[in-house]
Design a protein with these regions (language model features):
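Short glycine-enriched, charge-decorated loop/helix-capping segments at active-site entrances
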Residues: 16-22, 82-87, 116-120
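Conserved N-terminal subdomain of the carbohydrate kinase-like
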Residues: 1-79
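Nucleotide and nucleotide-moiety/phosphate-recognizing core
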Residues: 56-64, 152-161
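Residue-level detector of conserved, well-ordered beta-strand and adjacent loop positions
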Residues: 165
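Short glycine/threonine-rich catalytic loop with a Thr-x-Gly-x-Asp
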Residues: 168-173
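Conserved phosphate/ATP/ADP-binding segment of small-molecule kinases
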Residues: 87-160
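Structural motif
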Residues: 1-4, 42-43, 68-70, 83, ...
Length: 173
């Protein structure tokens, strides 16, 4: 079963983000606890964590419940480029959240922010994946949808790289 924990409510469309309302850390904790007490998940996928307080609440819950598989998709920007994560939270993401991940799945702009480097080609994606892996996660998948040409994702597990390439599908969303 798919179960959700809401960390923020975002009002947005394809042109802009008009508002973000954070859910309190206490409410995040209650949601996570209620999920785990009912149906223990086989995997956890984490998306938008936009504040230090939200990241801390989620990280503490992960330490308590110790899920086997944790996928972190560090949602930092909306499709239109609007920021969804406060700049002061990026360090907390790197030091507190990323080390708890089985897999981190940033897109290119997010990988640039986390790895602290520009990405302009597949080689750069590999270097960024290694840099992010060194932050403590088990594996990294950099999503190449923001690059030009075919969409190529780069997966790195600490030992080997895999490239996954397909034709780009143009969408507004």
């Amino acid at each position: 079963y798919g179960m959700s924990v809401i960390t923020a409510i975002v009002a947005e469309n394809t042109y802009r983000v008009s508002g973000i309302m954070d859910v309190s850390p206490d409410m995040i904790d209650k949601q996570i606890r209620d999920v785990y007490e009912d149906i223990y998940p086989d995997a956890v996928k984490i998306g938008m964590l936009n504040t230090i307080e939200t990241m801390t609440a989620v990280a503490e819950s992960l330490k308590i419940w110790q899920p086997q598989n944790v996928v972190i998709d560090p949602v930092m920007y909306a499709k239109n480029g609007s920021p969804l994560m406060s700049l002061d939270a990026i360090e907390t993401l790197i030091k507190v959240v990323v080390p708890l991940a089985t897999l981190v799945t940033p897109n290119i702009p997010e990988a640039e922010e986390i790895a602290g480097m520009m990405i302009s080609n597949i080689g750069d994606m590999k270097v960024a994946a290694m840099n992010i892996h060194e932050m403590g996660c088990q594996a990294v998948l950099i999503k190449g949808g923001h690059a030009k040409g075919d969409a190529t994702d780069v997966f790195y597990d600490g030992h080997k790289f895999y490239q996954l390439t397909t034709s780009r599908i143009q969408t507004k969303n």
